[in-house]
Amino acid sequence: MAIKAIVMDIDGTLLTSEKKISPKTRQALVAAQKQGLSLILASGRPTNGMRPLADELEMAHYNGHLLSYNGACVTHHGSQQQLFNQTISKSLSQQILEHLKQFDVIPMINDETFMYVNDVFHHTLHLETGDFNIIEYESRGGNFQLCEWHDLAARLNFPLNKILIAGEPAYLQKYHEAIYAPFKETVTAAFSAPFYFEFTAKNIDKARSLEKLTLQLGIAAEEVIAFGDGHNDYTMLEWAGTGIAMENAVEE
């Protein structure tokens, strides 16, 4: 069957190592849209952090869509209308945030405007590429203002699309099962990078949200080509008629 939709993960896939869209990639994706193909960006990023990239790809002009928060939210980019929005309840989010206090991780949550963290000075990850200010990186990438709440669980008063935790890669590999264990029946969790582990509502992932969106668009899975590199892309690449794992993809 002919391809009717292109789905692109963002970090590690659409973007270069400098976090930019290369001119060649931009030209190819705009040309594909001009030919009638639907372009869908699918990311763990918040919606606000995806919009500038969608603008660069002229997606508003060609009826493109954004799957943000690993599929918890689906938005038509041109109208900014939410077609799907699934959150973790406030009470369950509070339980998860309380549970995270016993681990050496950096939880990050957000609303439309602010990103909230326990301690703005507890931000450094020691990666192979050097020390990395993860809070600055994440707030800038999501176009958020930064706000410090010393007790996220106690202060939280709204449901969340996603709970993001950052940590040293070796530490997360060792403890991610213990972090997830109490909530396996109530939420979905996945790595989006070696230093990111993310919670979304139960049965939320990129594949399920893509299936709902493409059904509305009248596009079959066999007519979709998807590109990704992370653990959180696995279901999407399996679901699409053509799934392409990037050269830098994690082994699965």
Regions found by a protein language model. Give the residues of each.
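Non-catalytic pre-domain segments flanking phosphatase-related domains
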Residues: 1-10, 27-30, 34
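Asp-based phosphoryl-transfer active-site loop
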Residues: 4-19, 96, 237
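Short, well-ordered beta-strand core segments
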Residues: 6, 66, 106, 243-245
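Short, acidic loop-to-helix structural element flanking the phosphoryl-transfer center
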Residues: 19-36, 85-92, 146-150, 201-215, ...
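Active-site phosphate-binding/coordination module
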Residues: 23-130
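Phosphate- and divalent-cation-binding pockets in alpha/beta enzyme and binding domains
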Residues: 24, 49-52, 174, 209, ...
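Short active-site oxyanion
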Residues: 36-40, 62-64, 162, 222-223, ...
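Conserved acidic, metal-coordinating active-site core of Asp-based
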Residues: 99, 103-105, 110-227, 231, ...
